[in-house]
Amino acid sequence: MEGERAAEADYTQGQIMVIAATERNRYQNIYTSQLWQVEADPEGNTFEEVLKDQMGRFLVELATVDQMAQEQGVELTSQEEDSLKSLSQEYYAGLTQEDLDYMGVAQDEVYDLYCMYYRADKMVEEMTQGQNLEVSDAEAKVIEIQQIRLDTREEAEEVLTLAQEEGADFASLGARYSTDSQLARSMEWSEEMDALGDAAFALEQDAVSGIVEQDGGYYILKCVNAYDQEATAVRKERLAQEKKSEAFSGIYEPYAAEHVVVLAADTWESVDFSLGEGCTTDNFFSLYQSYFAE
């Protein structure tokens, strides 16, 4: 069902090509150009068609959030504008002639696109302020364990006795007896864990569990790192971003339903991934992150 108002996203063809070239090259620089005509879904769409559809959704969402930001009076400071100008200059200076020939974009178009992207980011930050987005260390906790899997309880009891002996080498026991070649595992805490998760997070550093029965197997666990600091920090950041995205979705989705934004019907007509040989630029977003990483 269409919303009350519809608007066409105000992108230049050069800006469309910046996004298209960036996303095309992120894949093509790794997998070569042969992937574009590969069937990518059950409907028979090619990888190029699927990627263009994904880019289309991104561009619509970006334009919608930018429209929200302008209606809410979200403005850029002079310092932010200066940073975005420097960013645009660095990005543009890094483009080769082949990049420019394929994208056909001017530096001021790059600057306007970066401003739009930054304003959308700023909108998300301002609209989610005051909401509880905190993620505790306990909530994000990641641990490392070693596990031995046995097929019968009798075998598990025998191996557990060996594992509990003073000076026992748990890893060697696992290599000798476990029916699962995967000895080491990282585990993430969650509110709904299975029996293995519950047993693992109950262990202190270097402690060995009892026998844990799950999915037809019998497990013995050893905690080798009760707090993986680096992995926990990475997960904490990811969970916080997920909370922020979820909080903003509650604001964005009702707005988007009432303020429909569409791309021009001919947006992709002149975007051909088979052209632009020699165009390899793929750092539009990564360069932005290097300037404005939290």
Placement of each model-derived feature along the sequence:
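N-terminal targeting/tethering segments
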Residues: 1-103
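Soluble non-cytosolic domains of exported or imported proteins
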Residues: 46-63, 75-82, 109-118, 150-154, ...
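A general structural motif at alpha-helix termini
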Residues: 20, 85-88, 174-178, 239
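Sec/Tat-exported extracytoplasmic proteins
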Residues: 27, 59, 63-76, 88, ...
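Surface-exposed patches in mature extracellular/periplasmic domains of secreted proteins
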Residues: 72-81, 170-174, 209-212
